[in-house]
Amino acid sequence: MQDQERFIWPHKDLLDVTQLSREQIRHLLDLAGQFHEINQRPVKKVPTLKGKTVVLFFAEPSTRTKTSFDMAGKRLSADTFSLAKSGSSLVKGESLKDTALTLQAMSPDVIVIRHTSSGAAQFLAERLECAVVNAGDGWHAHPTQALLDAFSLNRAWNGQFEGKTLLILGDIAHSRVARSNVHLLTRMGARVRLCAPRTLLPAGADTWPVEIFDNLNKAVQGVDAVMALRLQLERQQAGLLPDLREYASRYCLNLNHMQHAAPGARVLHPGPMNRGVEISSALADAGQSLVLDQVASGVATRMAILFLHATRKDTGDR
């Protein structure tokens, strides 16, 4: 790819956005931009990773992320294979070690893993010679989602993160997406606000480089983008939030809220959406919504991620 020969990707694995420098994030976003252009062509497949093997190991249910990675690999001409969770034994560390040995025997070039346990991706990365890409581990991290969100915002903000403000709204306590976006966007120079009921804020959030609100009307003032998060309905059963009607009356993002945001402010949602709970249907379908753009961005961004990790120079760094 253009300029790739002059930039050596130093990381064997992508486990968390915290491992990436600002320059590396910018390079990845620029590369994703090239793949995004390719994806607009009538023929979208390129021979870039022909002969490479990508294994999709999803030990947690996923439709969007798994499909996005599968499409990304196929558009790069890689051979992609899916390995599904089989039984409860994969949850335990010893069985995950056995799984790592099984995967190693397949001689893949990249393994994409999603797992219910925080740290599962790192566990594999420390035991495998091939590249490991974290597609979400427990509540810990979801680096590829944060990178695709940054790619969507990069396009919407004309490449300028400095001086921009993103509001993240909803169930932040249980969101690996929120954690990864906070780390990535603040590293790129953006400001981040959080808005949620106190019961849905993570412990230690007051030490993050963010502003925290529990009032949406105040939180949305002057922001350049709002990311509404999926409300995990099982949290209501755990007593962490009131009934859905009361939650929606206070935290469902709508067109009226966006009138108080900065001119041209955009709306994001990592999906799947609970319309009328986290975001109104009218706003989700409005012109300022980037929800469908995030889906397209996901394929291009994951093409860049697979390309970098399947072709990187062997520096020994993680």
Curated annotation (Swiss-Prot):
Q: Mind telling me which PROSITE patterns this protein's record contains?
A: CARBAMOYLTRANSFERASE (PS00097)
Binding-site residues for L-aspartate, renumbered to this chain: 92, 176, 230
Q: Which GO terms describe its molecular function?
A: amino acid binding; aspartate carbamoyltransferase activity
Q: Does the keyword Transferase apply?
A: yes
Q: Which Pfam families match?
A: OTCace, OTCace_N
Q: Name one GO cellular component term.
A: cytosol
Cysteines paired by S-S bonds: none
Pathway note: Pyrimidine metabolism; UMP biosynthesis via de novo pathway; (S)-dihydroorotate from bicarbonate: step 2/3
Q: Which UniProt keywords apply?
A: Pyrimidine biosynthesis, Transferase
Q: Which InterPro entries match?
A: Asp/Orn_carbamoyltranf_P-bd (IPR006132), Asp/Orn_carbamoylTrfase (IPR006130), Asp/Orn_carbamoylTrfase_sf (IPR036901), Asp_carbamoyltransf (IPR002082), Asp_carbamoyltransf_Asp/Orn-bd (IPR006131)
Name the positions where carbamoyl phosphate binds: 64-65, 114, 142, 145, 271-272
Q: What is its EC number?
A: 2.1.3.2
- One GO BP annotation here? amino acid metabolic process
Q: Where are the transmembrane segments?
A: none
Q: Does the keyword Transferase apply?
A: yes
Reactions this protein catalyses: carbamoyl phosphate + L-aspartate = N-carbamoyl-L-aspartate + phosphate + H(+)
Q: How does it assemble?
A: Heterododecamer (2C3:3R2) of six catalytic PyrB chains organized as two trimers (C3), and six regulatory PyrI chains organized as three dimers (R2).
Q: What does this protein do?
A: Catalyzes the condensation of carbamoyl phosphate and aspartate to form carbamoyl aspartate and inorganic phosphate, the committed step in the de novo pyrimidine nucleotide biosynthesis pathway.
The entry sums up its family as follows: Belongs to the aspartate/ornithine carbamoyltransferase superfamily. ATCase family.
* PANTHER family linked to this entry: ASPARTATE CARBAMOYLTRANSFERASE, ORNITHINE CARBAMOYLTRANSFERASE, MITOCHONDRIAL
This chain belongs to which protein, by name?
A: Aspartate carbamoyltransferase catalytic subunit
Q: Species name for this entry? A: Oleidesulfovibrio alaskensis (strain ATCC BAA-1058 / DSM 17464 / G20) (Desulfovibrio alaskensis)
Q: Which gene encodes it?
A: pyrB
